[in-house]
């Protein structure tokens, strides 16, 4: 448990069953735990006042109730097969026991581009474990990757992607539920490292390639472009949660994108990645989060210790301190969808200018031209005269109607 600023819930807040499931199961690979949902501490804190689960996922999950999250998983599961004109296999449930000996109903399935999902339903608790590194079509899992660094998977299990969320309650309870978010690290249970090359091959052959062409399919954009841009950051869990919340807030503001309980990909991810911010953090982001009281003033409130990955140490090098790392300019990826390109054309280019893809498709900026700060004095005066004539025509028309 590396993130000291996130406190574990006291045992008196939970019954024995919850303690066994949340704390005892796979503690070794749990990065941190954050209480969310009903009754969460620090009311008004951005993470607890939002209904969104602060984890980077293809569509938003709920932190207030298990039902919207599970329903979105079910919808996405069926849509992923129907989009390929395949009959979706039924969810198979098994009655199993957890490490504490408690019985629960368990199902596990693969859902691109999200990853491997494991759902455990107890009498008064719902647990979901998601490993986003499991993608046999766009990630590699070679037999000797532990010995050969060059064979390591390009998308590893990381606390920015892999997580366990536990809701205190069942699907049929109408009121808001307590929720705990546990970030998981490399080697966690029910993750990629438990799959052998044979398992990987079976999953890969279980269905056709589920993604569309580069630059056209937002699912492929998420599977590669988004995951590669969020893993590996030497940032604390609170910082990652704040960045994930910004990621979802931008997406959910577009009415065409999925909301809570809707399991499908949005139109684009580039603007959400831009809101997510620098993958490895920056001094600008740290200053903003500190100034808004989202994190503490100490460096360890922003950067975390990742010695085993070769990133920044907890105590920075005086010749190269972490707080001088500036955010790099945001770049458009080749996975950007047509909606992304049109968005950036409108945002970055003057009216009439365009972006042309290698296939010859052009996206022309149609934003409004502001003559006050984008025109010459002559153009500005001509525009003022045009606006004045328009007002005069309206005034004369109203005067003639009155007569």
From Swiss-Prot:
Coiled coil: none annotated. It comes from the Viruses. InterPro entries: Foamy_BEL. GO terms for biological process: positive regulation of DNA-templated transcription; viral process. Belongs to the spumavirus protein Bel-2 family. Bel-2 expression is low. This is Protein Bel-2.
